[in-house]
Regions:
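Hydrophobic, membrane-inserted alpha-helices
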Residues: 60-69
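Extended, low-polarity transmembrane helix blocks
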Residues: 1-31, 38, 52, 56, ...
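Cytosolic, membrane-interface loops and tails of multi-pass inner-membrane proteins
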Residues: 34-49
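N-terminal, well-ordered alpha-helical segments
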Residues: 41-44, 65, 85
Length: 173
């Protein structure tokens, strides 16, 4: 295996691991959203207006962006989705719980921080040669500083826009 193959293998592994994990979260959300109001009620308890809409939005984003990452399709946009979900999760739920994910009652922010930086890295590095972006000859156009800018601006901007439109922090008792 030469250096290029090693880099492509590493990027593939990172994309697949992140994409499958993201898709798995979406799959669980889909099952729970369809079962009843539990997920929507949880979004509402975080201060999200239109909690059912927000539950469906995050579910569909996770179900769509996960496979996009796995296959390396429009990678900076998929990375932006990961970043956006992580930003919203951090601000609404995880930031007050401390760093470690096992902190209770809500998990700490280490996981969402890791997702944010993985999204930024994939935006900058691109999907590698073993991807649909490469097969469609757009990988070079959508990586480097362009990919990083797309992932960061769309991810952070999209997350902050969602918060601006929907989030009203609950008053602490």
């Amino acid at each position: 295996m030469d250096d290029a193959d090693a880099i492509n293998a590493a990027l593939l592994a990172l994309r697949v691991a992140t994409g499958l994990m993201f898709f798995a979260h979406g799959w669980v959300h889909l099952r729970r959203v369809r079962e009843g109001p539990g997920v929507a009620n949880w979004f509402g308890s975080l201060g999200m207006r239109q909690p059912t809409l927000n539950a469906w939005m995050v579910t569909l984003v996770e179900l769509g962006a996960g496979p996009m990452l796995v296959f390396g399709l429009l990678t900076p946009l998929a990375a932006a989705a990961v970043i956006g979900v992580a930003v919203v999760a951090w601000i609404t739920n995880h930031r007050k719980a401390g760093f470690f994910v096992y902190n209770r009652p809500t998990e700490g922010w280490e996981y969402v921080m890791l997702l944010t930086f993985v999204g930024l890295a994939l935006g900058a590095l691109g999907p590698g040669e073993w991807s649909l972006d490469h097969a469609f000859d757009v990988a070079d156009d959508l990586s480097g500083s362009t990919g990083l800018a797309i992932a960061a601006a769309a991810g952070i901007g999209g997350g902050l826009l969602q918060l601006l439109v929907f989030w009203r922090p609950p008053r602490e008792a």
